[in-house]
Amino acid sequence: MVERGPTVYLSGLREKHFGELFLNAYNVSESSSATQASSSQAASSELGLSEEGLKHIARYIEYFESRYNDIWLVFHHEGVSLSKLMYTVEEAEISSEKAEEASHGQILRPSKWWTWLKTTESGKEEMRRIIWQLLLGLKACHDRNITHRDIKPENMVICLEDIKSGRCLKGVPNGDQNFKTNMRIIDFGSALDEYTIKHLYGSTGPSRAEQTHDYAPPEAILNSSWHHGPTSLTLKYDMWSVGVVMLEMILGSPNVFEISSVTRALLDQHIRGWSENFKELAYKLRSLMEMCILIPGSSLKHGGASSKQGGISLASWKCSEEFFAEQIKSRDPLKIGFPNVWALRLVRGLLQWYPEDRVTVDEALQHPYFQPPPSS
């Protein structure tokens, strides 16, 4: 159910718009596949490759409004979110100077499933399969000039389908259970296409309020009118988010762009008096520098050079594959890092500062990391 209120109401209408769009596309695809199967196997194969991504979009059923103008959106149950599979929640007591003010909070820890994902060959293949299916789902979006704009583990719902019953398993499967993985993208309330920008975002248009900061690319953080550019660049928003999701799966932490407490303390000396929003932006940019995504003192298109300010080296490291791999490995709780060099290179291709430099969804699907393509 979507409660009343103009902003949330419009979000619900966008969900309805995209739900109906993908439902119609899926029905047309199924009809076309049946026709092609009877006439040309080659054409059928090509169509199947093009439309396979529709199987990785949440299945919309219907929409209706109550007499109080509440919106009800009905979707199939598709499983549990990737975030719930990746993390376990632990209760923690948050201390305070006054004992009576002590409160309880929750801490996310990597789950046993995540450890399996990282430490076994079948787990590494599962990670490839999940990212592959995510890209297929995005291909179904991008082929229709739709930018999802909120790709993150919470919006990636996974069904570990039991082969015998066809139902989603409850919890993490044990070694004796035979299952197949199916990931679907949910939550199109922040998505963009030509129609929604004109009719379903109100007079002010899309804003940062519909974005999730940790998964948003630099252009969307720094420029509120980023979506006014060519559609080919707008779609690159999602490709950045895929890169962040991959790093999160590798690190077992949602804090992908996090700087050390020492670096933060040094940086704070130079940004005293700044607002909290600008401080958070400074921390984010510093993290992007450390990951060789933002290189200060030079244009990214003309190589990088180190720069110094206030006696502190801003980029005194070499932005090589080896440096990046070692940096990720050091932050990995298991000290494993990337499963192979192809995963590293795909992430670097996704996390490019300039959207025009990022790989497209088709290029990502053809990347050596996915050779041979994951099995279903």
From Swiss-Prot:
InterPro entries: Kinase-like_dom_sf (IPR011009), Prot_kinase_dom (IPR000719), Ser/Thr_kinase_AS (IPR008271). GO terms for biological process: mitotic DNA damage checkpoint signaling. Transmembrane segments: none annotated. Residues 1-370 form the Protein kinase domain. SUPFAM superfamilies: Protein kinase-like (PK-like). Disulfide bonds: none annotated. GO terms for molecular function: ATP binding; protein serine/threonine kinase activity. Gene3D superfamilies: Transferase(Phosphotransferase) domain 1 (1.10.510.10). It holds the Pfam family Pkinase. It comes from the Eukaryota. GO terms for cellular component: nucleus. The protein kinase domain is predicted to be catalytically inactive. Belongs to the protein kinase superfamily. Ser/Thr protein kinase family. This is Probable inactive protein kinase At3g63330. It comes from Arabidopsis thaliana. The lineage of its organism: Eukaryota, Viridiplantae, Streptophyta, Embryophyta, Tracheophyta.
